[in-house]
Amino acid sequence: MSQTPLESSKKNGFFRGMQRYRCLDCKHVFNNKRRDFTSYWAAKIWKDYIDHKQTIQELCERYSVSHPVIEKYLDSYQVTPVIDYPSSAIVVMDTTYFRRGFGVSIFRDPNRKINLLWLYVKHETLDTYKYGIEQIIAKGCSVTGIVCDGKKGLFSSFPGIPVQMCQFHQKQIITRYLTKNPILPAGVELKAIVETLSSTCEVVFSMFIELWQLKWDQFLKERTYSSTGKWFYTHKRLRSAIRSLSSNMPYLFTYQKYPNRIIPNTTNSLEGINSSLKAKIKAHQGIRDTRR
């Protein structure tokens, strides 16, 4: 029985998106039916542009084509993420900005290390986070815990779901009020207590905060009077720092109350994603917002 051309040959790699074959008799190499040439080059150029951080000018020189041709290939490439939503997940969420009025809110499963959802936003709002959680639940994924940065009103927005305040963000808030090197003895002591936040438990931490408040109670109540007779608290920033800790205390140790759920105590799992995104954007400074 005679063999067809493909039966008497074997695959011999690819060339510009086309399958190559080698004849077993005469050793001649030939190409099969042409594949999707545009899609092949669009994917290749996109990978160089995003993963290898090559600029459009560098791509023009590498592929010996004009600027509009490279842009055409980039615009034609369609990124279609496929997300396999788990039956349940802890969600770490935060928003990072690339410039004023342009940011991305990311919802990530830190235990499986996958991004469940991302939304392009102008501003960080409660509605964005509520919408994101609703969308994840709508996909059949039960949210068993949330880790966030403690934006005002966020804790009460998800009844029935344990919410963990990012301890790193809490430390940043205190540093913003007290500075990295506080001068007042009360500030020095409070900052030292806050530094133990990630290595202690709620009972011990609360005890130290209460003792600090008792010790510096009169100091915190000191007033300064203006020439008009109006008064204000002398140590406003110190008062703001302790108020922040007191308000967030119920959510700083949520992860210890649900040990079986493996809830992180920070949103640090998003930092690698945010840093990578910003590095890619930085490599292409000056690009249009639509391409950004």
Could you tell me what each predicted segment is?
Residues G145-K191:
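Conserved beta-strand -> loop -> alpha-helix junction used to position metal-binding or nucleic-acid-contacting
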Residues K53-Q54:
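Residue-level signal for the short linker/turn that defines the boundary of a DNA-recognition helix
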Residues E58-Y63:
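Short alpha-helical "recognition helix" segments of helix-turn-helix
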Residues R20, K27-H28, N32-R35, A42, ...:
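Acidic/histidine-rich catalytic cores and adjacent linkers
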Residues F15, V29, V65, V69-K152, ...:
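RNase H-like nuclease fold core
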Residues M1-R34:
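Short, conserved DNA-binding cores of transcription-related domains
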